[in-house]
Swiss-Prot record:
It is found in: Mitochondrion. CDD domains: At1g26750 (cd23701). This is Small ribosomal subunit protein mS23. The modification N-acetylalanine is found at A2. InterPro entries: Ribosomal_mS23_dom, Ribosomal_mS23_met. It comes from Homo sapiens. Residues 166-179 have a biased composition (Basic and acidic residues).
Length: 190
């Protein structure tokens, strides 16, 4: 059972030598006599790597490009956006990539202030039709105001809240009665 032995036990030379002696290998490999005549100074035996505790310090420093700072600021201000990356299209450019290209283009024109350049880049992309939404804007537009719903309920008196709920209940009931008639008309074949 020569194949049942682990490769980590002994060197390739000692394993091959034992297989030749046992008669499993009929012919010696070409390298066997050369290895036997000129053995290496240190026999190549597998040794398990030592287990290291703790975090090893990486000797390689991180590589940061000028664009990376622009991208980091873009994602912190505007987020990742709603549009997914189209990986099937080789000519696809993400909103962030367009922003970085426009930023560097405006920077080459002579603008040096980073904050002003960042704002001008956003305006330039808006002029091209790219809509950028800040991270906090989507939440405030959804609610209709800058006040959160929890603080809204705390400032409203209970009686006015009940009156609003009653008016909201009345309106949907009237709309609900009209909706089935419209739907039934649309479902019937002409």
């Amino acid at each position: 059972m020569a194949g049942s032995r682990l490769e980590t036990v002994g060197s390739i030379f000692s394993r091959t030598r034992d297989l030749v002696r046992a008669g499993v290998l009929k012919e010696k490999p070409l390298w066997f006599d050369v290895y036997d005549a000129f053995p290496p100074l240190r026999e190549p035996v597998f040794q398990r790597p030592r287990v290291r505790y703790g975090k090893a310090k990486a000797p390689i420093q991180d590589i940061w490009y000028h664009e990376d700072r622009i991208r980091a600021k873009f994602y912190s201000v505007y987020g990742s956006g709603q549009r997914a990356f189209d990986l099937f299209n080789p000519n696809f450019k993400s909103t962030c990539q367009r922003f970085v290209e426009k930023y560097t283009e405006l920077q080459k024109l002579g603008e040096t202030d980073e904050e002003k350049l960042f704002v001008e880049t956003g305006k330039a992309l808006l002029a091209e039709g790219v809509i950028l939404r800040r991270v906090g804007e989507a939440r405030t537009q959804h609610g209709g105001s800058h006040v959160s719903r929890k603080s809204e309920h705390l400032s409203v008196r209970p009686q006015t809240a009940l009156e609003e709920n009653e008016t909201q209940k009345e309106v949907p009931q009237d709309q609900h009665l009209e909706a089935p008639a419209d739907q039934s008309k649309g479902l019937l074949p002409p």
